[in-house]
From Swiss-Prot:
<dbReference type="GO" id="GO:0051500">
    <property type="term" value="F:D-tyrosyl-tRNA(Tyr) deacylase activity"/>
</dbReference>
<dbReference type="GO" id="GO:0000049">
    <property type="term" value="F:tRNA binding"/>
</dbReference>
<keyword id="KW-0378">Hydrolase</keyword>
<dbReference type="InterPro" id="IPR023509">
    <property type="entry name" value="DTD-like_sf"/>
</dbReference>
<dbReference type="InterPro" id="IPR003732">
    <property type="entry name" value="Daa-tRNA_deacyls_DTD"/>
</dbReference>
<comment type="subunit">
    <text>Homodimer.</text>
</comment>
<keyword id="KW-0963">Cytoplasm</keyword>
<comment type="function">
    <text>An aminoacyl-tRNA editing enzyme that deacylates mischarged D-aminoacyl-tRNAs. Also deacylates mischarged glycyl-tRNA(Ala), protecting cells against glycine mischarging by AlaRS. Acts via tRNA-based rather than protein-based catalysis; rejects L-amino acids rather than detecting D-amino acids in the active site. By recycling D-aminoacyl-tRNA to D-amino acids and free tRNA molecules, this enzyme counteracts the toxicity associated with the formation of D-aminoacyl-tRNA entities in vivo and helps enforce protein L-homochirality.</text>
</comment>
<keyword id="KW-0694">RNA-binding</keyword>
<feature type="short sequence motif" description="Gly-cisPro motif, important for rejection of L-amino acids">
    <location>
        <begin position="137"/>
        <end position="138"/>
    </location>
</feature>
<dbReference type="GO" id="GO:0019478">
    <property type="term" value="P:D-amino acid catabolic process"/>
</dbReference>
<dbReference type="GO" id="GO:0043908">
    <property type="term" value="F:Ser(Gly)-tRNA(Ala) hydrolase activity"/>
</dbReference>
<protein>
    <recommendedName>
        <fullName>D-aminoacyl-tRNA deacylase</fullName>
        <ecNumber>3.1.1.96</ecNumber>
    </recommendedName>
</protein>
<dbReference type="GO" id="GO:0106026">
    <property type="term" value="F:Gly-tRNA(Ala) deacylase activity"/>
</dbReference>
<keyword id="KW-0820">tRNA-binding</keyword>
<dbReference type="GO" id="GO:0005737">
    <property type="term" value="C:cytoplasm"/>
</dbReference>
<dbReference type="Pfam" id="PF02580">
    <property type="entry name" value="Tyr_Deacylase"/>
</dbReference>
């Protein structure tokens, strides 16, 4: 499982001109699922997302996690994160999970996140989404489990 994590002032996802998810301060996370990913890897990813200390404390040091700042978590499925770009100019997507597996694991991640934290919003698996955000910093990390 691969995630691009961005600290944001606010972020949202629209599908067909309707908002499917939006947060204020928090983390906007693009999530890619590999064919061999498991619920255990999704659990590890959630642990990292909730615990990653990327928000500033009173001294201005990145020392607080999303829960400590009562921030939101916007989870957006994105199979293109798993693309292979090492050969040629056309990305290959063999590294992405088949849709049924990818959706099941993304849904599992979302369910676990909602169980652990009340401020969770999502994009829509398989949809053409428009994602907007105000990146804070910018602070961006790539995490793999």
């Amino acid at each position: 499982m691969r995630a691009v994590i961005q600290r944001v002032r606010h972020a949202g996802v629209d599908v067909d001109a309707r908002t499917t998810g939006a947060i204020e301060q928090g983390l906007m996370v693009l999530v890619g699922v590999a064919p061999d990913d498991t619920q255990t890897r999704a659990d590890k990813m959630l642990h990292k997302l909730l615990g990653l200390r990327v928000f500033s404390d009173e001294a201005g040091k990145m020392n607080l996690n999303v829960q400590q700042v009562e921030g939101g978590l916007l989870l957006v499925p994105q199979f293109t994160l798993m693309a292979n770009t090492t050969k040629g100019l056309r990305p290959g997507f063999d590294g992405a999970a088949p849709p049924a597996h990818g959706e099941a694991l993304f849904d599992y991640l979302v369910a676990q996140a909602r169980h652990a934290w009340p401020y969770v919003a999502t994009g829509e698996f398989g949809a053409d989404m428009q994602v907007s955000l105000l990146n804070d910093g910018p602070v961006t990390f790539i995490v793999e489990t």
